[in-house]
């Protein structure tokens, strides 16, 4: 019996080449290549905030050689803003789901501070809590949707892992031992979120073409929203500004 000739494309059998092309061009793979990025800035003269006082616990105070900056307003060069959470709040494909990463989001207790101060996590993603200080801390979450937990972490407990089972808007985390310790977290069903460092920059990748509402959040100054339309393989820029409300 005569075998049919096997055509080859760049050394790859045609049947395999066709399969690879089909996978490459399939919706949700080829299309999910757009991004939205930007910079968050503070508009106006920044208010002077008192440094964090840790005198109540000498073990904490000794971990710092000088004043500890208040995290409520974390500014960089040119008044760029850290500790801003940015996410896609509307416009994602209805009914689409995204698997939770197995890589944990980590909250460290270091220098008697929560690091990072602001973060996002996906539903079901591991949430690793570290105690790098060697002093007593506790993690007291204040959600409205997920079950709250209040977990003591003595010096001997260096690590604990949990997760959140439901999506939830930003909520507060505090330490009952050290009242100045504060953090914020939001729980998402999707991976389209980013938290800024003091350079104020954020990037949200892996978006399909469409029009999205993007929200930027600050713990005291509230939210800013913008509508952003992206095309295929598009890179859009959307900046945000925050300011102290006029009295």
List PLM regions with ranges:
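N-terminal secretory signal peptides that target proteins for export/translocation
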Residues: 1-12
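Bacterial N-terminal signal peptides
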Residues: 11-27
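Extracytoplasmic copper-binding redox domains, predominantly the cupredoxin/blue-copper superfamily
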Residues: 30-247
């Amino acid at each position: 019996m005569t075998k049919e000739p096997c055509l080859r494309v760049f050394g790859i059998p045609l049947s395999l080449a066709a399969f690879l092309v089909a996978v490459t061009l399939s919706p949700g793979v080829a299309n999910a290549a757009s991004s939205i990025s930007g910079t968050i800035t503070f508009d106006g003269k920044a208010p002077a905030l008192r440094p964090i006082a840790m005198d109540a616990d000498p073990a904490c105070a000794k971990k710092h050689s000088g004043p500890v900056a208040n995290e409520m307003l974390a500014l960089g060069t040119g008044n760029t803003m850290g500790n801003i959470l940015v996410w896609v709040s509307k416009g994602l494909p209805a009914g689409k789901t995204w698997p939770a990463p197995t890589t944990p989001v980590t909250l460290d207790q270091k220098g008697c501070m929560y690091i990072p101060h602001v973060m996002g996590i996906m539903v079901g993603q591991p949430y690793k809590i570290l105690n790098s200080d060697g002093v007593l801390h506790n993690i007291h979450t204040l959600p409205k949707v997920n079950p709250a937990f209040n977990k003591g972490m003595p010096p001997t407990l260096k690590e604990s892992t949990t997760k959140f089972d439901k999506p939830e808007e930003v909520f507060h985390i505090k330490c009952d031992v050290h009242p100045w310790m504060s953090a914020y977290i939001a729980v998402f069903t999707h991976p389209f979120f980013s938290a800024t460092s003091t350079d104020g920059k954020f990037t949200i990748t892996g978006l399909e073409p469409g029009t999205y509402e993007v929200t930027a959040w600050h713990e005291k100054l509230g939210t800013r929203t913008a509508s952003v339309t992206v095309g295929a393989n598009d890179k859009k820029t959307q900046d945000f500004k925050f300011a102290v409300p006029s009295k």
